[in-house]
Design a protein with these regions (language model features):
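C-terminal motif of bacterial Sec signal peptides marking the signal peptidase cleavage site
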Residues: 19-22
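Bacterial signal peptide processing site
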Residues: 24-26
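Beta->alpha turn/N-cap motifs
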Residues: 40, 67-69, 79, 83-93, ...
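A conserved helix-loop-strand patch within extracytoplasmic ligand-binding domains
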Residues: 106-155, 256
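Periplasmic-binding protein-like
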Residues: 107-118, 143-150, 207-271
Length: 271
């Protein structure tokens, strides 16, 4: 009986050690963090933030790239990544409302102005009646684009629509423009479509075909835009030291200089 009891004690101790070891392996390294970014120009900027985070804080950053605006928040919500850096607050607010995400801003990055681009006309004076205008179809960037068209005098929106007007809120359209909603990643390619005369494109996607607002835009969003981009965390990790350090790294002169270069002066500090 004594031998049997001793064996059980030893076995229990070994099992406990294995459980503890397993728990230790599952614990997150406090000096490592996964950050979701959009492939392309924003990824280039984030690479500099990654280096600054390592050099200044000893933080190991793994960048996880995405090709659209939907999956980075989904991955963050699931816990596949720890942060993302690609969106402005109106977009995040809409995503939280639509999908009940427990996400929150952790810090500001840059304002990336949207602009109107065309391969068919050189100025808005050349825009013909009935022209087709491509716009992003997600609610916040659609609203942002419609407000920009209104500012150019191309349409008039119903009063009181705030930052989220839709095409149904257009009350005046003197040129009879046909407003075509597309997925944001499709907008750069739409410029080669014979049917599309003008496209309003976010700087992130415009930069993928080497377009910049200041040089190539027929009209550009003001730099005092409310659409400042943000770094986003979950509510359960927003106060972690790693999150704070990555935000500080992103808000460095080194990262601003890279963004200014990559976007040809199209990036404006949001902090």
């Amino acid at each position: 009986m004594a031998f049997k009891l001793k064996s059980l004690v030893v076995a229990g101790a070994l099992l406990g050690s294995l459980v503890l070891a397993g728990c230790g392996q599952n614990e997150k390294d406090p000096k490592s963090i996964k950050v979701g970014v959009i492939v392309g120009a924003e990824q280039q900027v984030a690479e500099v933030a990654k280096k600054v985070a390592k050099d200044k804080y000893g933080l190991n950053v793994e960048l996880v790239t995405f090709n659209d605006y939907v999956m980075p928040n989904e991955a963050l919500s699931r816990g596949d990544i720890d942060l993302n850096a690609f969106q402005h607050k109106p977009y995040l607010d809409q995503q939280i409302k639509d999908r009940n995400y427990k996400l929150t801003p952790a810090g500001n990055t840059f304002v990336y102005p949207i602009a109107g681009y065309s391969k068919k006309i050189k100025s808005l004076d050349e825009l013909q009646d009935g022209a087709q205008v491509a716009l992003p179809n997600d609610p916040t960037n659609l609203g942002r684009s419609l407000l920009l068209l209104q500012k150019q005098g191309l349409i008039k929106l119903k009063e009181g629509t705030g930052l989220l007007p839709t095409v149904l809120d257009v009350v005046e359209n003197p040129k009879g423009l046909k407003l075509i909603e597309l997925e944001a990643p499709q907008l750069p390619r739409s410029l080669d479509d014979n049917k599309i005369d003008l496209a309003v494109i976010n700087t992130t996607y415009a930069s993928q075909i080497n377009l910049t607002p200041a040089k190539d835009g027929l009209f550009v969003e003001d730099k005092d835009s409310p659409y400042v981009n943000i770094i986003v965390s979950r509510e359960d990790n927003k106060d972690s030291e790693a999150v704070k350090q990555f935000v500080q790294a992103y808000q460095s002169d080194e990262v601003f200089n890279e963004a200014d270069k990559v976007f040809n002066g199209g990036a404006v500090k949001g902090w």
